[in-house]
Design a protein with these regions (language model features):
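Active-site acidic/histidine proton-transfer and metal-coordination neighborhood
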Residues: 16, 23, 89, 102, ...
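Acidic-and-aromatic substrate-binding clefts and catalytic sites of carbohydrate-active enzymes
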Residues: 78-91, 111-121, 148-152, 187-193, ...
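Acidic (Asp/Glu)-rich catalytic clusters
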Residues: 35-39, 68-73, 87-105, 124-136, ...
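Active-site mouth loops of central-metabolism enzymes
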Residues: 48-62, 110-122, 154-157
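A cross-domain feature marking catalytic cores of carbohydrate-active enzymes
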Residues: 44-48, 81-83, 105-110, 142-144, ...
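A short, hydrophobic/aromatic-rich structural module that often spans a beta strand
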Residues: 84-111, 160, 188-195, 264-267, ...
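Histidine-acidic metal/acid-base catalytic patches
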Residues: 2-26, 30-43, 48-58, 62-72, ...
Length: 317
C-alpha cells in the first residue's frame, strides 16, 4: 500500500457507549434507522483512526480516552485495537467501561513462519488473550507477519507449512480458553495464486482457525477483482467469524464506507443465505488520493449509518 505517511504496514510493524449511547439512539431515530439497524453491534479497528488523526495533525497516542470518546460519538459500539502486550489491556479496560465502548475482538501480530519464533509468538498471544477475555473479548484476530513488511519476498512452501501448523496450534489453545482465532490477510498473501492465503485455510482445522474476511484486501490483492473476492466467499464463507469493512471508488479508498467498487449488499446477502453473521468491524481508512472533506468522527458516523443499513439483517435479537 502506498499513501499516508503512516501506512498499514509500518503501523503494524512499529506501533509498540454509555455516554454516547443515548445520543446515538436519537441520531438513529432522526436518520430513520430501523430497530434492527440500531440493534446491530458494529465495531471499528484502530488503524483508520490513526491515519485520520495523522491527516489532521493530531496525535493518536496522546489520549486513548479521547479516541474512545470519538468512537462513541460516531455511533459505533466497539473497538478493535492492535494489542502488543497484556499491559495494554489493563489500560484499556477502565476506559472502555467509562466511554461505553465494547472490545469483542482484538488484533495481534504474530511471526509464525519461523519455527524458532513461533512458540514465543504463540505465548505472547495467549498472555494477551487471557487478559482480553476478562474484559469481554471473544475473537483474537491475527495476520501472520510477512518475511518483510513491504518487501517483495514470498514465503517458501516449507515456511507455509510451519506457519499453518503454528496457526492451528494457536487456534487450538485459544479454543481451549473459550476464544476463537480469526485469520486475517493483507495483499501479500494473495501473490502466487494466493498460495499463502489458501494454505492457511486448507492446511488448518476450521474448528480452530476461522477467517477474518478483509474484503478489500482480498479485492486489491487479487488485482482489484470482485470475482476473486466472491470466489473466496464461496470457498470459505462458512469459516467467516469476522468481517472487515472498507470501500474504494476507482480503487482508491473513500473517507466513508458506502457504495463503491465492492458490492457489500451482495456480500451481506451471501453470508445471510449461508447462515453466517460475523462480527462486523469498520476499517475505512484513507490513503493517497482519498478525498479530504470529513473529520474523523463525521467520516465514521457516515460509515456507521451506511453499514447499519447494509447489514441490518445481521442484528442479533
Amino acid at each position: 500500500m502506498t499513501g499516508c505517511t503512516l501506512n498499514r504496514r509500518s503501523f503494524l510493524n512499529t506501533l509498540g457507549m454509555a455516554a454516547g449511547g443515548a445520543a446515538f439512539g436519537l441520531r438513529g431515530q432522526a436518520s430513520g434507522m430501523s430497530q434492527h439497524q440500531n440493534k446491530l453491534h458494529l465495531a471499528c479497528n484502530q488503524y483508520p483512526w490513526t491515519v485520520f488523526y495523522q491527516r489532521d495533525k493530531r496525535n493518536f497516542d496522546a489520549s486513548l480516552d479521547t479516541v474512545l470518546q470519538d468512537i462513541a460519538r460516531s455511533g459505533i459500539n466497539g473497538y478493535e485495537p492492535l494489542v502488543t502486550s497484556p499491559a495494554q489491556i489493563d489500560q484499556l479496560g477502565p476506559l472502555l467501561k467509562k466511554d461505553g465502548v465494547e472490545m469483542r475482538s482484538i488484533y495481534v501480530n504474530t511471526v509464525l513462519h519461523k519455527a524458532d519464533e513461533a512458540d514465543k509468538s504463540i505465548g505472547q498471544v495467549l498472555a494477551i488473550a487471557g487478559k482480553a477475555k476478562a474484559v469481554g473479548t471473544s475473537i483474537i484476530v491475527t495476520n501472520p507477519s510477512p518475511i518483510r513488511w513491504g518487501g517483495p519476498e514470498s514465503k517458501t512452501d516449507d515456511q507455509l507449512k510451519v506457519q499453518a501448523d503454528a496457526l492451528e496450534r494457536l487456534g487450538r489453545q485459544l479454543s481451549a480458553m473459550g476464544l476463537r482465532l480469526s485469520y486475517h490477510n493483507h495483499d501479500v498473501e494473495l501473490r502466487n495464486a494466493a498460495r499463502e492465503f489458501h494454505h492457511m485455510m486448507v492446511g488448518t482445522d476450521p474448528k480452530h482457525v476461522t477467517l477474518c474476511l478483509d474484503a478489500h484486501w482480498v479485492y486489491r490483492g487479487s488485482g482489484n477483482s470482485s470475482v476473486a473476492l466472491f470466489d473466496i466467499l464461496e470457498l470459505y464463507g462458512p469459516r467467516v467469524t469476522e468481517l472487515h469493512l472498507r470501500q474504494s471508488v476507482n480503487q482508491v479508498w473513500t473517507e466513508a464506507f458506502g457504495d463503491g467498487d465492492i458490492d457489500y449488499r451482495a456480500l451481506a446477502k451471501h453470508l445471510l443465505t449461508i447462515g453466517i453473521k460475523p462480527h462486523l468491524v469498520l476499517e475505512q481508512a484513507v490513503e493517497q488520493g482519498s478525498p479530504h472533506l470529513l473529520d474523523p468522527v463525521e467520516a465514521h458516523r457516515r460509515s456507521n449509518e451506511y453499514a447499519r443499513q447494509v447489514f441490518a439483517g445481521f442484528a442479533v435479537d
